[in-house]
Amino acid sequence: MDVVDLWVNLVTSEGAREFLGQAQFANIPGYLGSSSTEGIATEGMLALMDELGVATGILCAGMDRTAEHALAVADEHPGRFLVALGLADSERPTRNVRRIRKLAEHTATSMVRVMPLNNQVAIDDARHYPVYSVCEELGIPVGINVGIPGPRVRSRVQHPELLEGVLIDFPDLVVIGAHMGHPYEELLMNYMRKWPNLYLSCTAYAPQYLDPGLVQFMNSKTYRGRVLWGSDEPWFPMRRSLTEARALPLDDDAMALFLGGTARRLLDRSAR
């Protein structure tokens, strides 16, 4: 079975401590039940992926020089990594568009991530619209964090209701809701029924706690393949996430789509 982890992070131990040392993220270790202070390097990530049977990881990078570093890692390990560009600065939309166009020349650039909790700029803010527009034009999916986040920040900026305007204004844009969207799963299922280009992922969320109605949705003949698996390693351990994901009561076809089939179709530009 082709397994694709939608969200992995390469981070040094120093970087992990610095990240978790920020006031808004200080509760993350307890919230996820993992210290995550040791970080993980490329070889450690590959060893973990090999052990667990994960073929490809979607590597989270910034729009700065970390993007080139991540793409170099993808080049060094063909087929093992694709790269997601995390939008950190929403204040300079034109620069972001130029960066996306440049980085999209590399086929390992698989998606752009909008994470409203980080900069407190809402999903439907006008500053994000140029990013959505260029991604729609280039056929690159956008991942958008939705729901109440673990960090102690205002969550209204990523309420799933804010997706509606984006989906209306960019009908050909593929949007993947990130980090589960809890406690708004029912709303997100209704949106997915309505919008064929909307997907959801369980990144940074324990699969054993998936809403039973969502699991039924994932198993249905009509909507299977609309929810994607991902861990957020090392912040949420890949081992725990994948073990719990494989234990869900999904039939073989639904499980294959959940664990990697849909991600491969949407994100692997070399396979199109």
Feature locations, PLM:
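Active-site neighborhood of phospho(di)ester-bond hydrolases with catalytic His/Asp-centered motifs
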Residues: V3-L6, L59-C60, A84-L85, R113, ...
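Catalytic pocket-lining loop regions of alpha/beta-barrel enzymes
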Residues: S110-M111, D124-L228
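Mid-to-C-terminal alpha-helical segments outside catalytic/metal-binding sites
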Residues: M1-N9, S13-T56, T222-L228, P237-R272
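A structural motif corresponding to the C-terminal end of an alpha-helix
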Residues: A47-A55, H77, L138, D169-L173
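Short aromatic-enriched loop/helix-cap "lid" or pocket-rim segments at secondary-structure transitions
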Residues: E14-L20, A70-L71, N96-V97, R154-R156, ...
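Active-site gating/metal-coordination segments in enzymes
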Residues: A55-T56, D64-V157, K194
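Short, acidic/polar
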Residues: E38-L48, E91-L103, E185
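Ligand-binding grooves and catalytic loops that recognize ribose/phosphate and carbohydrate rings
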Residues: S90-V134, Q216-M218, T222-W229, E233-L266
